[in-house]
């Protein structure tokens, strides 16, 4: 059944990423322009590393362009990974897949946002704009269409009423120029089932998504956030990351808690074909009892980030994998994944 009204009215909300998952959704690399820096073959191997790491903890369902199934099966077969043929433009299910919701009866719903290729970065996103509806139909979830240009990487939730996002992305004129900040807030609250929004200002320099929050800060537990920083005052990210840190330190969540703020340092500036990559340890995937986080080849930075994750995620197995090739495409581990929470079937 389709509903033209917002999910919150029916008791649906987006749970936190630490809520138990049914599966993780990914899509197989296929867009030559996206992967021009390293080539599609290396991109596929990088995605396979991520998929197999996540599949240690939960099932992975991989969307693959028709005709490209062999490469996916060769690299991923037999690792708790299901392959589904579906025409796609690109491979960022965080942004193009459905945003899954649950209610107190643990019934499943999905939000289908409007996708415009991150403000028109790519000419054709017509197939990717259909992915969310395919996922919602496949999972037999309740369907909600949101009349808002939005990507899943542009917000985080704590599942207890709080949304974390950035002004650089959501208030960008290439997304929803006809809407005010207050109107966008109301859409987010109604479609994510929340009460309060915390606005950070700027994302990372050179982020082609216009400052997605999943590169700079995230919830790690109720009342706790992890924030990206740099100690290098000459780095152009220094002031914007420091400002975000100060905002989080002075903010309260929907339940009135002042945040306990943890920080992780960004790795050194890294360039590929003259362009700085937006590397961030914040861009990880939280699976069932496991964390899949990136390594970038900087031993001391990678080690310190790993040790921090061991500390802040007690009870989770931390898996750190080489993710530089994933980030060469403009995003990270969180960007190429989308969790589906555990749920019960809707009662007809």
From Swiss-Prot:
It catalyses: agmatine + H2O = N-carbamoylputrescine + NH4(+). The active site is at 335 (amidino-cysteine intermediate). Transmembrane segments: none annotated. Keywords: Hydrolase. Its EC number is 3.5.3.12. One of its GO terms (biological process) is putrescine biosynthetic process. One of its GO terms (molecular function) is agmatine deiminase activity. InterPro entries: Agmatine_deiminase (IPR017754), Peptidyl-Arg-deiminase_porph (IPR007466). Belongs to the agmatine deiminase family. This is Putative agmatine deiminase.
């Amino acid at each position: 059944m389709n509903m033209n009204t917002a999910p919150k009215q029916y008791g649906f909300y987006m749970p936190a990423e630490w809520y138990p998952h049914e599966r993780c959704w990914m899509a197989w690399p296929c867009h030559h322009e996206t992967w021009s820096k390293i080539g599609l073959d290396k991109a596929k191997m990088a995605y396979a590393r991520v998929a197999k790491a996540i599949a240690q903890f939960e099932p992975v369902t991989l969307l693959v362009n028709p005709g490209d199934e062999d490469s996916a099966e060769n690299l991923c077969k037999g690792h708790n990974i299901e392959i589904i043929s579906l025409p796609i433009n690109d491979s960022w299910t965080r942004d193009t897949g459905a945003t899954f919701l649950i209610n107190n009866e643990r019934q499943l719903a999905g939000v289908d946002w409007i996708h415009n290729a991150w403000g028109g970065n790519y000419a054709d996103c017509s197939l990717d704009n259909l992915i969310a509806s395919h996922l919602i139909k496949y999972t037999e979830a309740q369907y909600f269409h949101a009349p808002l240009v939005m990507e899943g990487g542009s917000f985080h939730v704590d599942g207890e009423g709080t949304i974390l996002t950035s002004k650089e992305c959501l208030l960008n004129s290439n997304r929803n120029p006809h809407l005010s900040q207050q109107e966008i807030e109301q859409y987010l609250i109604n479609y994510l089932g929340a009460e309060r929004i915390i606005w950070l200002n700027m994302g990372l320099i050179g982020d082609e998504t216009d400052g997605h929050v999943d590169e700079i800060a995230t919830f790690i537990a109720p009342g706790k956030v992890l924030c990206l920083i740099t100690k290098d005052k000459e780095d152009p990210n220094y002031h914007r990351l420091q400002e975000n840190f100060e905002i989080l330190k002075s903010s309260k969540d929907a339940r009135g808690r002042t945040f306990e703020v943890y920080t992780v340092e960004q790795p050194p500036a890294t360039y590929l074909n003259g362009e700085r990559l937006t590397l961030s340890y914040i861009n990880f995937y939280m699976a069932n009892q496991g964390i899949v986080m990136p390594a970038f080849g900087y031993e001391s930075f990678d080690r310190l980030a790993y040790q921090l994750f061991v500390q802040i995620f007690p009870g989770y197995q931390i898996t750190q994998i080489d993710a530089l090739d994933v980030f060469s495409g403009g995003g990270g581990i969180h960007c190429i994944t989308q969790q589906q929470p555990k749920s019960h079937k809707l009662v007809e």
